[in-house]
Amino acid sequence: MSTIRCDIVSAEQEIFHGEATFVVATGELGELGIAPKHAPLITRLKPGKVVITTVNGEQLDFAISGGILEVQPQVVTILADSAIRADTIDEVAVRKAKEEAERILANRGETIDVAKAQQQLVEAVVQMQALERLRRTVKH
C-alpha cells in the first residue's frame, strides 16, 4: 500500500506526524483529496475539517481555523493557524465560546473587535462540526 507522510503543525505545536493513505482538507476552491504521489500543490485552507486516513484504515479528524497546505511527492504539510484533534475538543468550552462570540456580534459597539469575534465564532463552529462528525463515525 502506497503512503504519504503527513504533518499538521500550528504556531503552538506539532499536531500530527505520520503516514497516511489519504488526506482530505478544505481549500479556498473546495474540498481537496490528496493521495500518495499527488502532484505538487500549495493552497490556502479555509476553516474546517482535515481528515487523515492512516495506514491501518483509521480516520483521524482535526478542526483547523485556516492555514496553508503544501503537497510534495512524498509529504503533505498543513501549516494551520490553529488546529485540534476532534477527540480532544472540550464541547462545553466550545459551546461557551460560540455563545460568547454570538453575543458580542449581536451587541456590536464601538469597542469590540468584530474580526476577532467573527474568527472565534468560526473556530467554535468548526470544532463543533468536527465533534459531530466524530460522533457519527464512532456510532457506525
UniProtKB/Swiss-Prot annotation:
Membrane topology category: Peripheral membrane protein
Subcellular localization(s) per the UniProt record: Cell inner membrane
Signal peptide positions (record): none
Top-level taxon of origin: Bacteria
SUPFAM superfamilies cross-referenced by the UniProt entry: Epsilon subunit of F1F0-ATP synthase C-terminal domain (SSF46604), Epsilon subunit of F1F0-ATP synthase N-terminal domain (SSF51344)
Classification via InterPro entries: ATP_F1_dsu/esu_C_sf (IPR036794), ATP_synth_F1_dsu/esu (IPR001469), ATP_synth_F1_dsu/esu_N (IPR020546), ATP_synth_F1_esu_C (IPR020547), ATPsynth_dsu/esu_N (IPR036771)
Primary location class: membrane
A GO molecular-function annotation: ATP binding
Annotated Pfam families: ATP-synt_DE (PF00401), ATP-synt_DE_N (PF02823)
Family statement: Belongs to the ATPase epsilon chain family.
Oligomeric form and interacting partners: F-type ATPases have 2 components, CF(1) - the catalytic core - and CF(0) - the membrane proton channel. CF(1) has five subunits: alpha(3), beta(3), gamma(1), delta(1), epsilon(1). CF(0) has three main subunits: a, b and c.
Function, in words: Produces ATP from ADP in the presence of a proton gradient across the membrane.
Annotated protein name in UniProt: ATP synthase epsilon chain
Lineage: Bacteria, Pseudomonadati, Pseudomonadota, Gammaproteobacteria, Lysobacterales
Gene: atpC
